[in-house]
């Protein structure tokens, strides 16, 4: 696989189960080491790792479905910084404001004190996206973020991502089905039998 992602790209990667989407993500996230080929990000070969680049990652089904899972939405959000607050010179009040702003963007600010396990799958994904965005990443990677969402929620999510992309955020979203009707993505990739083809 030889792929390039340019700064400011909004890429959608689709494909059936077993087509190679998960393997590609594992290569990108360094869970697997490529035996050949390369992955270039912002004109730099990242096959050896991101080397300090700020990455926001929203994994699929990343939260426990146990309704008694003790963490609250606020506690989940507080893990979204790349460095401790004191290192960044951010006061507790300012960070609390950032948390609320990120949750508000995802229409989840009213759930701040709710247990994450009590939320629906779609609501949990919204919280995880807000968590990924609160640290101001350079690249946002999303693995099946629309799982459990209806068409209205998908449209709302994609509008948020589009606005972020227009402000310069580079996005790579993996999806089982086509999201062309919903997104303003500028590139569409399709995984087929271990190969990734640009449409």
Predicted regions and their residues:
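Conserved ABC ATPase "signature" region
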Residues: 78, 92-111
């Amino acid at each position: 696989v030889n792929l390039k992602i340019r700064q400011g790209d909004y890429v959608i990667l689709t494909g059936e189960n077993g087509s190679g989407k998960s393997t590609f993500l594992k290569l990108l996230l360094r869970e697997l080491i490529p035996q050949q080929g390369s992955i270039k990000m912002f004109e730099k070969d990242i096959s050896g790792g991101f080397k300090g680049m700020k990455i926001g990652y929203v994994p699929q089904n990343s939260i426990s479905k146990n309704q008694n899972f003790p963490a609250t939405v606020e506690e989940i959000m507080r893990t979204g910084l790349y460095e401790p607050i004191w290192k960044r010179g951010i006061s507790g009040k300012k960070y609390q404001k950032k948390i609320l702003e990120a949750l508000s963007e995802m229409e989840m600010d009213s759930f701040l004190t709710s247990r994450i396990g009590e939320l629906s799958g779609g609501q949990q994904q919204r919280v995880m996206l807000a968590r990924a965005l609160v640290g101001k990443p350079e690249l946002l990677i999303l693995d099946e973020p629309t799982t459990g969402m209806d068409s209205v929620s998908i449209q709302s999510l994609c509008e948020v991502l589009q606005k972020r992309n227009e402000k310069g955020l580079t996005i790579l979203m993996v999806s089982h089905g086509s999201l062309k009707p919903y997104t303003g993505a500028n590139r569409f990739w399709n995984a087929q039998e271990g190969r990734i083809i640009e449409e």
